[in-house]
Amino acid sequence: MANYFKAAVKPKTSNQRLTVTVDKLDMNGVGVARWQNKPIFIAGVLPDEIVDVKVIEQKSKYARAKLISIDKQSASRVIPQCQHFGLCGGCDLQMLALEEQLLFKQQKITDLFSRSFSTQNITPEINTAHLPWQAAIKSSPWHYRRKARIGVQFDKNAQATIGFRQKSTNQLAAIKSCPVLVEPLSAIFPLLKKLLAQLTVKSAIGHIEVIQADISDTSSADKIQKDNQVVVVVRQLKPMNDTDIGLWQLYAQRHCWHVIIDDGNKQLPLADIKGGDSFELSYELTDTSKVYFSSNDFIQINHQVNNAMISQALAWLNILATDNVLDLFCGLGNFSLALAKHAKRVVGVEGMQTMVDKATQNSLVNGLDNCQFYQADLNSHWLLEPWVQGQVFDKVLLDPARAGAEQAVSQIAELKIPCVLYVSCDPATLARDSAILVSKGYKLEKISLMDMFSQTKHVETMILFTHTS
């Protein structure tokens, strides 16, 4: 049977100029006004502002417009610190005062909880308008991010653009500096651009990742460590020739970079290819535990918030020396290592065996013999796994990815673990999973924001639940 395809209909545009009053921000931090009895979305504006805009897209149920000028400013408006704000897609809220950013994120969670609890008819009911909010965990709103992926694009004249994606497009915004990256990484863009211009094979680079990490020299017997070093990971689509290897080596020596070449299958320090000192990456927790990781591993990008988050988790859970603690979605052991220093035993579970192996190694390096790590698919049924059978857990911590932990929280409820600490990077799935726990006899005791990604719409949250029995 033949298949027939219709070409995509281009959105209607009118280029009409309007003056509107902004009612609110949507979940993504985009301003919402009313026009022709439908919402019109405008980036870069704030509630109660009167703005002149140009309509750039019309649909039957909504429209989009571009900000032209602001006739009446909000008292919450501040001057963005980044010269690329509005073009670069990395930040959403630089025009909004920091405390107002936190209120916006808190309201976002409140709205999602209200929606989730009402649609699921949760019993017992909780007053989602008055959640038990605690003080937010914050860091400096600038120069906090210790890891980022930088895009690379070459034009037909082999001229490089390096930076981050523009809003709603695959095109890159050419970045000169980034004020949310930690200081050593913030100023790396001009150096990379100069280096890329000198490469003999330019099409071989996919992207570049930059990381601030502690470095241990594995070629020496005493593993000499250097703190807060710059790591540059080069994603190569083709093998790098000797000339380009030499160029990267020159820049590494000149600017104290530690360069890693990623060919898609393995990651090798440039030193292993060219000869020289090899190294390992790590970061330190407040309790001096060392977490070793590879450049392609997930780590929390805000070092200060990460340490404060771990400290708050320990305080809220009130870990006792007699406690058996379950750490789900444990990753490299970011929480497990700290928990193990206070608990009788910690069982960490992660979906990827490679992460399980690294978490196990991290516990050994830190001299912890009361940690065991296991691999399991936590999005399936795991109550019959050997690490659960015959075990009694006093407390559980879970830190899932954005998809949340719908299967996991249902099984936690079956086990009736008395105390549950949920660390979330997605408020929608957090609201869904919280509704499940409350419906199965858990009480929401505490909730706090964690401003891991200041200046952006992204929301991280910590919630403590206790079983009502």
UniProtKB/Swiss-Prot annotation:
PROSITE patterns: SAM_MT_RNA_M5U, TRAM, TRMA_1
Coiled-coil stretches noted in the UniProt entry, renumbered to this chain: none
Keywords: 4Fe-4S, Iron, Iron-sulfur, Metal-binding, Methyltransferase, rRNA processing, S-adenosyl-L-methionine, Transferase
Catalytic activity of the protein: uridine(1939) in 23S rRNA + S-adenosyl-L-methionine = 5-methyluridine(1939) in 23S rRNA + S-adenosyl-L-homocysteine + H(+)
Active site: 425 (nucleophile)
Molecular-function GO terms, alphabetical: 4 iron, 4 sulfur cluster binding; iron ion binding; RNA binding; rRNA (uridine-C5-)-methyltransferase activity
Amino acids binding S-adenosyl-L-methionine: 300, 329, 334, 350, 377, 399
Entry's Gene Ontology BP terms: rRNA base methylation
Enzyme Commission (EC) number: 2.1.1.190
Pfam family, one: tRNA_U5-meth_tr
Domain TRAM: 11-69
Annotated binding of [4Fe-4S] cluster, by residue: 82, 88, 91, 178
Record family assignment: Belongs to the class I-like SAM-binding methyltransferase superfamily. RNA M5U methyltransferase family. RlmD subfamily.
PANTHER family the UniProt entry points to: 23S RRNA (URACIL(1939)-C(5))-METHYLTRANSFERASE RLMD, RNA M5U METHYLTRANSFERASE
Role this protein plays: Catalyzes the formation of 5-methyl-uridine at position 1939 (m5U1939) in 23S rRNA.
Protein name: 23S rRNA (uracil(1939)-C(5))-methyltransferase RlmD
Species per Swiss-Prot/TrEMBL record: Colwellia psychrerythraea (strain 34H / ATCC BAA-681)
Lineage per the UniProt record: Bacteria, Pseudomonadati, Pseudomonadota, Gammaproteobacteria, Alteromonadales
Gene: rlmD
